[in-house]
Amino acid sequence: MSNVVVCALYKFVSLPHFESLREPLLSMMEQAEIKGTLLLASEGINGTVAGNQAAIDALLIWLNQQNGLENITYKLSFDDEMPFYRTKVKLKKEIVTMGVEGIDPLKVVGTYVKPKDWNALISDPEVVLVDTRNDYEVQIGTFKNAINPVTETFREFPEYVKQNLDPAKHKKVAMFCTGGIRCEKSTAYLKEQGFEEVYHLEGGILKYLEEVNKAESLWEGECFVFDNRVAVDHDLKKGQYDQCNACRMPITEAEKLTPDYVQGVSCPHCIDKISEEQRKRFVERERQVNLAKSRNEAHIGSDVNHVIEARRQKKEALRKQSAEKNKAKQANA
């Protein structure tokens, strides 16, 4: 039996004084030796943490005692090793960042579909099935016949909808994500845009894998998760993928054998995207990691989100440039 319990949780709820929750929540997690990150915002709480069973039970009890955080949505999985290095509670503007003002899942949201009913819904030929996750997540697994919007961040999803979905044409839209939280916002957004029949998988992919028999499953591949496991299989056990420590993309054993892969420095996905300055920094970080290992010490490593953010900014700049060119063409027409 795996002795590390991984708990993914979220709840959309009005928390006008969410800042005051940070210190007591962080203190509780540290005392219970829980690692991972929880996000707090005026719209609720979201995150994934891990610890022993008693610690996770204590956290859920603590949250249930806080005003507004009763009956929080959570999913448990298990691992042999702690998948997180740090304990964090962050204050945010949104608990899942879409970047669109006024989207409130507490006011309007799509129709929840339980895992046992999901296969029937997505087998309907009139249903447009959309994976709301990022492209690197979709690449290693998704539902049969699902559309991949090819987004790098959730911020790009509204633009995908504007360019590709039409409420007059697409009468039934079903969406899914890892644990359900992104679909809370994506379905709320579609409802705001005039789509009438909008559905989403209750509990997300993780709940589906937990409850639906593999023989009946329409899931193909593995499910990306945002911790050191990288991905889980249909049994919610650690999958076959590793992760590039430079760009955080999931990588296969075959990709690790290519010349582009250098442990902790680059992989085929990011070899052409990292700067020389970044490469040098990653080389030094890897040297420090190996030095710590030789001393039998823990090394947390540095934050590599700047690589992902740089990629997002570059794509956004290209999108704006394209939009400006289209405006110029229309003006000259």
Swiss-Prot record:
Signal peptide: none annotated. Keywords: Oxidoreductase, tRNA processing. Catalyzes oxygen-dependent 5-hydroxyuridine (ho5U) modification at position 34 in tRNAs. One of its GO terms (molecular function) is oxidoreductase activity, acting on paired donors, with incorporation or reduction of molecular oxygen. It catalyses: uridine(34) in tRNA + AH2 + O2 = 5-hydroxyuridine(34) in tRNA + A + H2O. It is an enzyme of class 1 (oxidoreductase). It comes from Shewanella oneidensis (strain ATCC 700550 / JCM 31522 / CIP 106686 / LMG 19005 / NCIMB 14063 / MR-1). Residues 313-327 have a biased composition (Basic and acidic residues). This is tRNA uridine(34) hydroxylase. Gene3D superfamilies: 3.30.70.100, Rhodanese-like domain. The gene is trhO. Residues 123-217 form the Rhodanese domain. The active site is at C177. Belongs to the TrhO family.
